[in-house]
Amino acid sequence: MQKEKITILLTVLVDVLGFGIVIPILPFYVTSFGASAFTVTLLFSSFALFAFVSSPFLGALSDKIGRRPVLVFSIASTAIGWFVFAAADSIVLLFIGRIIDGAAAGNFTVAQSALVDISTDEKDRAANLGLIGASFGIGFMLGPLIGGVLSTVSHSFPFWVAGGLASVNVLLTSLNVRETNTRRDRSMLLSINPLAPLARAAMNAELRPFFLNWILFGISFMSVQTIFALFVQEAFGFGSFATGLLFSAMGVFTAFNQGFLLKHVWLKHFSEAVLEYAMTIVLCISLILMALSILPLFFLAIILIASAQSNLRAVITSRVAGLAPPHMKGEILGIMSSLMAASMVIAPVVAGALFEIKSVLPFVLGIVLMGLSAILEHRSLRRAAEKKGP
């Protein structure tokens, strides 16, 4: 089981490394085509829109035919998408490249489902999902640093490298990842309508609060992430290399938090519910510090936001996976990805429009949404305490 876990985590790491290489460079690459900041955010949204449509279907497909074939297909599509993006000579081709990747964006969801499959209990499940976050953090630690260096060759070169890494990952996954879904339901009917699984999930009273908090978190965090490179360029004069270093620093703190602190500190001393509430407040505070545009406070906010957002991802996902029926875990986690993708559709458009009015406004939006989420979580904790009694 330990070997399976390491193999899945390595697959995630290679995938995120490719993404980490290009994410700080992407706004500068797109603007070299003469695109506006709003067009940059629309590119993020195009990926997310198609991920919103495909994620529940791919998750359900992995419940039906297994995790491994869906994972291989998804990573192969990522490679094709990055190659199209790198070879683009027009804004239209840039959109096509992101759409291809978005339409098959099931790799992260399926990897999560595979780790949930081999988890032994609630604590192990949250810790395993935290390790995925740690892999994500390492990818974002190394990727932007590599991307910053590669961008000195040309703005398109990092995207060729990302496509090459995804191609290697297809081979790695095909040869080393074995099937973890022992409860495949080949008789289940699949629907390509993305609203069908969302409607089913919305009927589940236990899951609804988690879905709402997930959307609020998604819109808040993605609004800031989308305009991050543009904001630090305006506020502090940072270019692509310095922006890559900031993303790398965030990756260091995310990896340390998810790989060590989550299991050995946070989950050891706090319940998942309390940890979710606390990290929501920390995320809100970090956005306030960023909005002040004071460099030392901004660096502090990088540490706080890396810890808070990574804990929230792991804890909310773990709680939802624990409530999902065994034969529907892939679909439910796919719905989580779909909701995050919906946030990625909404957030970049709104953030881009707000940024063009005043650069600090996307942070204000995030503060308001996370404040609302904290209020909802506080009420949930209070109801749980009242139900438990003295």
What function would you assign to each model-found segment?
Residues 52-89:
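Conserved MFS/SLC helix-loop-helix module at the cytosolic interface between two early adjacent transmembrane helices
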Residues 97-138:
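Cytoplasmic helix-loop-helix junction between adjacent transmembrane helices
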Residues 178-212:
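Juxtamembrane intracellular "pre-TM" segments in multi-pass secondary transporters
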